[in-house]
Amino acid sequence: MTSRVSRLDRQVILIETGSTQVVRNMAADQMGDLAKQHPEDILSLLSRVYPFLLVKKWETRVTAARAVGGIVAHAPSWDPNESDLVGGTNEGSPLDNAQVKLEHEMKIKLEEATQNNQLNLLQEDHHLSSLSDWKLNEILKSGKVLLASSMNDYNVLGKADDNIRKQAKTDDIKQETSMLNASDKANENKSNANKKSARMLAMARRKKKMSAKNTPKHPVDITESSVSKTLLNGKNMTNSAASLATSPTSNQLNPKLEITEQADESKLMIESTVRPLLEQHEIVAGLVWQFQGIYELLLDNLMSENWEIRHGAALGLRELVKKHAYGVSRVKGNTREENNLRNSRSLEDLASRLLTVFALDRFGDYVYDTVVAPVRESVAQTLAALLIHLDSTLSIKIFNCLEQLVLQDPLQTGLPNKIWEATHGGLLGIRYFVSIKTNFLFAHGLLENVVRIVLYGLNQSDDDVQSVAASILTPITSEFVKLNNSTIEILVTTIWSLLARLDDDISSSVGSIMDLLAKLCDHQEVLDILKNKALEHPSEWSFKSLVPKLYPFLRHSISSVRRAVLNLLIAFLSIKDDSTKNWLNGKVFRLVFQNILLEQNPELLQLSFDVYVALLEHYKVKHTEKTLDHVFSKHLQPILHLLNTPVGEKGKNYAMESQYILKPSQHYQLHPEKKRSISETTTDSDIPIPKNNEHINIDAPMIAGDITLLGLDVILNTRIMGAKAFALTLSMFQDSTLQSFFTNVLVRCLELPFSTPRMLAGIIVSQFCSSWLQKHPEGEKLPSFVSEIFSPVMNKQLLNRDEFPVFRELVPSLKALRTQCQSLLATFVDVGMLPQYKLPNVAIVVQGETEAGPHAFGVETAEKVYGEYYDKMFKSMNNSYKLLAKKPLEDSKHRVLMAINSAKESAKLRTGSILANYASSILLFDGLPLKLNPIIRSLMDSVKEERNEKLQTMAGESVVHLIQQLLENNKVNVSGKIVKNLCGFLCVDTSEVPDFSVNAEYKEKILTLIKESNSIAAQDDINLAKMSEEAQLKRKGGLITLKILFEVLGPSILQKLPQLRSILFDSLSDHENEEASKVDNEQGQKIVDSFGVLRALFPFMSDSLRSSEVFTRFPVLLTFLRSNLSVFRYSAARTFADLAKISSVEVMAYTIREILPLMNSAGSLSDRQGSTELIYHLSLSMETDVLPYVIFLIVPLLGRMSDSNEDVRNLATTTFASIIKLVPLEAGIADPKGLPEELVASRERERDFIQQMMDPSKAKPFKLPIAIKATLRKYQQDGVNWLAFLNKYHLHGILCDDMGLGKTLQTICIIASDQYLRKEDYEKTRSVESRALPSLIICPPSLTGHWENEFDQYAPFLKVVVYAGGPTVRLTLRPQLSDADIIVTSYDVARNDLAVLNKTEYNYCVLDEGHIIKNSQSKLAKAVKEITANHRLILTGTPIQNNVLELWSLFDFLMPGFLGTEKMFQERFAKPIAASRNSKTSSKEQEAGVLALEALHKQVLPFMLRRLKEDVLSDLPPKIIQDYYCELGDLQKQLYMDFTKKQKNVVEKDIENSEIADGKQHIFQALQYMRKLCNHPALVLSPNHPQLAQVQDYLKQTGLDLHDIINAPKLSALRTLLFECGIGEEDIDKKASQDQNFPIQNVISQHRALIFCQLKDMLDMVENDLFKKYMPSVTYMRLDGSIDPRDRQKVVRKFNEDPSIDCLLLTTKVGGLGLNLTGADTVIFVEHDWNPMNDLQAMDRAHRIGQKKVVNVYRIITKGTLEEKIMGLQKFKMNIASTVVNQQNSGLASMDTHQLLDLFDPDNVTSQDNEEKNNGDSQAAKGMEDIANETGLTGKAKEALGELKELWDPSQYEEEYNLDTFIKTLR
């Protein structure tokens, strides 16, 4: 069965295959847009999306639900009684009357049927369940549960269900067997054909499973519902409708008819567009809710045993019910009361089913923090969507059922144990109920019930139940607090007691409980209750007692809990009542400070810091009795100890001293008397959960200082934030305390042997100064003691930066360096044979160690070993060893150098961080020092070299502070130099700012293309990568600093820093009008740098700066875009593009007006190159922001895709490929604000062109200006419209309609029309452009006559010359060429006489069967590509036969460069597509293949048009292909077996040596021998045959002739087939007729046959051995290579016109192309082409327009031979070919071409692999079981892991089940 994938299907498949969620969502949203544009196709769209709701992949189901929601949102609400409300009897149109008549008759039929008890729709509701009958106890007692998978995967049912399982298994086997029989049955007469071994069944099962997994989802029939079935079962319903359909009224303006005007105005072509099979559904289409079918399918799936199907069904119902609950089950013809009742019953039935799922579902997915029950969550959302549409009575019933689910009263359920999953489901239902129907709860007094349920849930032992219970009240706390105080008090008491109990690390519910508590504490009512309780029980209920209960959760293992407790602390701090702040003390400060030091999560680290700052601020405001320094008196020292713990390097960690870590009063241990349990649930995982895992120490790596595990940045960031928090704390201390602390503690940190304390002390001092100055009035100075204490130490080290000691943290790197030095010395001894005594002594102890002395090993020692010592030792080596030892010594020496550089780098980074913070501090407490250089150098070094972003940003802030101080002190020159250096940092990365001197030589090249090829080449260069990394770091530092500078100085920055304006604009303005050739390297680099700086700084500029300084200079930038130097054009293009990303309207308006016209500048290559390069960079930098402007770019790009310059061509096509895929999205984009009016109008004009290009159905109808003698069908007129569109815009294309649809006729129409229009224009204008030019048709030689005949038939007014025949014939024809309108020639002639044909320019150059030029390297392809023509057109039924590369060759003829160079195409498309064909490729490679295929499809989409016969010809009879098997004859069998035995080993060896040409040749010869033998033994028995004598003996013994028909079973089979067709019947009954003395002869046979063979010899045997000997009455003709190509059309014509000719004998090569042989209705292949496309084309000679009979195709195949195997494979290939070639194009609406490429789709290839495996032996079949999957696992491990279906990560669950987001969708 062939896979059929239209463009719409491709769009739908993106729901599953999209590489990111953004892509998948976009695909889903486009489904909604399609539904909006084509509401009549809503059901069709839904049927395609529906299967994706039920797949295994989570994200696919969710995206499919989104698509369903988008589709149904655009369907009108269904109210069949709407007209009941409208009075009046206005007369309508005949169509309206017809509809009224249909409805009236329908009503009568309904009433009649009801009276006869045949149809009573109301009584059909008996299967619906009601809430009154919903009994929880019965449901739970039934024993039925819904787990993760069905009973086929797990034995979950009791003994009672054994029979069901057995029956299911039996049905499975029956189904598989029947499938096997149907597909593999070769010959009905062979009794053993249906007998299948167990192995075959197992293989079939696997194959079925694989194909199920790999084939695209087929649309599902969602139109059929119980209601529509009931309606259709009414008597005479169809007849009634049929009679109505044929009534006169229904023919008026009938939308089911296509009417096509013809050139001859007296004719109209009228065609039916609706197939009869669809008529039946249309009878009831307007009588039933259109979604009834899908609604019922989803209802059935809601109770599926597979959780994925349940989940998908719930999602689908949710989307359906949101808008369309009102329409469920309503039927036209019922009264409103009846419909209301039906609707109410159906919705009640849905509610009861949802509740049942709550009760029975047991599936849960454990994600990090909690369990998520996706089925129950989605069912709860569906219930919420349903509740909006239900009345009060049903809502109360649902609430009561949910309450039963939660409480599970044992008296009611009769079960001793409660089922927590049912409770969980009930709570989820109530959670959504509460959010949706808040007012309803108050109106019916249900809020107290809700509270009771919440309290019940909170008191359960299951975390998941507690978590949902807590979340129920969170959205309605403001309503809840209005209840009586006792209820609030109970809840608050419960929550605090829970927090006291939930003290283990796996309590996932803590976060939800804390969120609820935080919300409650926002309300004064709750605070009042807490105050009152505090007065009564101060020790228990004051905030001072309550808040410490939260402390243990600060370091909880679950991040959401840590976040919740921090948010709760902020909530408590924001309470306005001062009396609630009595819990602020030293302990909470210290615990939160520890949180900062220990937190690895960046978001929570920042939140911890914010909480700490809030604590300080509130303490300062509220507490006056105790100063902050008093509070910190006991905590300052321990905090500083922890903060100053050194941060080591890999190989040496420094752990925090645990005695300084304060633990909260409540520890992490479980109470010995109770242990909590995780909720037991069914999950896909069998991973055991270890016991006693309650405490997880998440802080262990941080406490241990584990650099390897955490990375340097994670640890450093916590210390930097800690230092900032510490500094902030100190800024609130009293001066006396500060002075003492600075003198006795902090200043000593500056002299510690570790670098970390020194750096952090620097940060503390600088941040302290900054905080202190912010807290005090402007102008007030820092206390003098700060400068006195720190200034001497810091200044000394800044002035003597080289006098730093070697820090202890550097010891590991020095030890590693020493090891490399020792290794070098050892190499001298081991390889260089140097005596030990000649080696220098290297100290064992390294600098930095505690015992290190003055002679300890350091970097200096290593440098001596590397240089001085190395040279001495090498000289002293024996000469005989020098050569041998040179390579090992150089390697070892290089490793020493690498280690030296590494050690220096580490030391430099650490000293740099220290000095930068010292410099920052001195600037703050001393102001500008006299010696600025040490300060500037330290800060700038940190900006350009610091790897930690926080430290780099702090250095940048200090540089900006320095610039401010310099400006205040009028030191403009110094500040200007700093800014100049910062701008220099932006230009060091040559990937961003090119090097002028290197690129100045390029003038007629596009630099973008050069840089891209260079970047690919440089990827593997390690040195370049390191330099690039350093340049990027420097650029990043410059950007950070300049961004801060722009923020601080604002719009006045260019006034305050004139040097910056100069850097930005002066060099551009100075050289604006200067010739590029006169610019020297220095000036050129300045210009390039200006562009680079402008690009980088533009995003930081204010709007006023942009308007006044940048937009006014666009003309200056434009001069450089037009420069003759590539580097200037590149810089200007990138600058424009980056500016457009920020200010799109201004830049794009200028681009459209001033720059796009340059793309058509024929006289200036630099204009075309610059403008094309700009568009390329616009598409890259703007990404989807370019959407509103895409419409302006397409046409100029199309023009440049055929540019004479290769670089322009390549870049234009690359750009076109990237933006063409955005065109479908452009239509929905509003005009950008501020876009000038004339551009808005222009956009509409451009859109008209684009719409025609992307959707030929929008192509303007082309009325033929001349009378073509043919009647065009609708689709043919559409094709001509498309060809006319291509003609108008000078585009070229491929018309690849299915064979037999009239490609020739459509081509004649456009050629003849254009010829006429050009002639008309020439007569008016005498323009050279419209002078008369002939058109050239190049086709296979057998079709030259066919084209001549077609032109004579349809356009006889055109003079046609067939330039074909031998050289002498062609010589006589050459004089006629100059006068011809049409020249028809063959490919061979075109190649041989290219010089003759090239003398003429052509209007059209048409390649018929254009796939012949698929090999781009062939002389033929190269020849036709040299022909000059205004328009190029390829006609082919099969544009791709084997390889996607063939498509490149076709487009290289049409538009050279459109698909890039062949090499580029290979890299971008062919390789990834080919790689994805291998079933063993990774999922990443598979996706790359799919994306490449999709990208290629989108790029070629506008230039290929394909329609299929079955889609455009409703009157074309079917084509039936059958295999006809025959056994080998005895002689053939003997020869075949002898050959295979002897040749098998030889062939095997040849296959091993298949790279050798001779080996390949031998294999081919062997295959050809076997192939010929299968046809006839005479074809192989040459005089040289080794067994000739044996054969002759055999023939003598049997008395047979070699050419006897007994020796040729294929001829016997052919005779039998012909007899069955009624051909040659006279020969059977000849004897009988002679006896009766009168002849039995039919002049015309019932059937006529085309008989195809590969070889002319085989045709001879059919003619001589069969027809002449055994079937002399058969009349026949022959068409093979011996017939002159010019005479072949005569043979065709005679055969078609003379029905008494029974058979036409053809060779596939000659008769398989382009010919119209509709006179035959039977096609018989005696021999077969190994390329299935050729056979496919051959059989379509008969199956084409004009054929009135069913076409039967017979393939005669010899059983048990190579032929059968090859044909089995070919049969598979034909399936793929069918996928590729016979794909529907959805008419012209999608102009689809991807089906032509689907041969390269991974899905199809997998099928091929399976087919080949099934042909293998049992070992191969067995091996299938154990192929490693993408995880690398096989066997049972693979199966086990395979059960773990892919779910989303927690963040995606949060997104899908976010209550607030969901509620918004309902409103």
UniProtKB/Swiss-Prot annotation:
Pfam families: DUF3535, Helicase_C, SNF2-rel_dom. The modification Phosphoserine is found at S93, S677. Residues 181-203 have a biased composition (Low complexity). A motif (DEGH box) lies at residues 1408-1411. It is found in: Mitochondrion; Nucleus. Residues 169-228, 1802-1822 are annotated as: Disordered. PROSITE patterns: HELICASE_ATP_BIND_1 (PS51192), HELICASE_CTER (PS51194). GO terms for biological process: negative regulation of DNA-templated transcription; nucleolar large rRNA transcription by RNA polymerase I; regulation of RNA polymerase II transcription preinitiation complex assembly; regulation of transcription by RNA polymerase II; rRNA processing. A motif (Nuclear localization signal) lies at residues 195-211. Keywords: ATP-binding, DNA-binding, Helicase, Hydrolase, Mitochondrion, Nucleotide-binding, Nucleus, Phosphoprotein, Repeat, Transcription, Transcription regulation. Residues 1284-1457 form the Helicase ATP-binding domain. One of its GO terms (molecular function) is helicase activity. One of its GO terms (cellular component) is transcription regulator complex. HEAT repeats lie at residues 289-326, 445-482, 541-578, 1108-1145, 1188-1225, 1495-1537. ATP binds at D1297, D1298, M1299, G1300, L1301, G1302, K1303, T1304. It comes from the Eukaryota. Its EC number is 3.6.4.-. The keyword Transmembrane helix does not apply. Gene3D superfamilies: Leucine-rich Repeat Variant, P-loop containing nucleotide triphosphate hydrolases, Tandem AAA-ATPase domain. Regulates transcription in association with TATA binding protein (TBP). Removes TBP from the TATA box via its C-terminal ATPase activity. Both transcription activation and repression require its ATPase activity. Present with 6560 molecules/cell in log phase SD medium. Forms a complex with TBP which binds TATA DNA with high affinity but with altered specificity. Belongs to the SNF2/RAD54 helicase family. This is TATA-binding protein-associated factor MOT1. It comes from Saccharomyces cerevisiae (strain ATCC 204508 / S288c) (Baker's yeast). The lineage of its organism: Eukaryota, Fungi, Dikarya, Ascomycota, Saccharomycotina.
